C-alpha cells in the first residue's frame, strides 16, 4: 500500500494527516538544528571583533567536506589543464600572477578562525586569460582570477583584496556544501508537499518554481555574507575595507542592464554598498591596527 494517497480516495485523510505530521517534524527538527548553530555562533561572535554573520547552517552537515574538497581539486586541475591547452593560463612569472599571490599570502593567515579545515588546505592562486569579470575560490583553497576583472575594472590592490576575500569567504563558510544540503532538503520537502496535496503535474511545476526561488534567495544570502566576511579578512590583512564601496561602484557601472535583484543570484550593487558601509565601523579598527604593524 502506498504511503500517500490522493485526497479523493478512501483513507486519504488519515494518510494526509500522518504525512503532515511527518513533514512538520522534519521542518521543526531542521529549525532546531539551525537555532542551536546560530546560538553557539552568537556566543562565539560576542567575544570577537569584526562582522557578525552567525553560525554555519546545519544543512551543510549532510554533505562530506572532504569529498567536496577532493572533487574541487580534480575540477581545479582540469580547469588549469584546459586553460593551458589553449594558452590561456598566465605564467607564474607574470606580474599580475605575482600580485595576486602576494595579496593572497597576506589574507590566508586570517582564514583559520573562520574554518579550521583551512590549516590543511593547500592554497593555490592562478590567473586565466579571459574577458570575464570573474573570480572564484573553490573548497580547499583553489583560487582563480580572470584577467577581465583586473583589466576592465582597473582594480587597485585594495579592491583585488576585497574580491579575493569575498571568494575565499564562500569557501571558508562552506556555501557550496550548504547549498547541496539545502537542495536535498528542498527536494524532499517539495516531493512530500506535492504528494500531500495531490497536485500531480501542476504541483510539480509549482514546487519546482518555488524551489528555484528558494535557491536564488540562498545564493543572495551567501553573497551578502561573503561580502562581509571577505571585507573583514581584507581588513585584518591590512587592506582598506572602504575599497568594497569603490569595487561595487565599478561593478555596477560595468553591469548595466542586469536583471532585477529578486530574480538575480546576486544582490544589487546598491544593496551591497549599503551593507558594506553599515559594517565599516566594525572592521575599520582592524584595518587601522594592521596598517600600524611594521
Regions picked out by a protein language model, each given a short descriptive name:
Residues 2-7, 13-21, 32-294:
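A Zn2+-metalloprotease active-site environment signal
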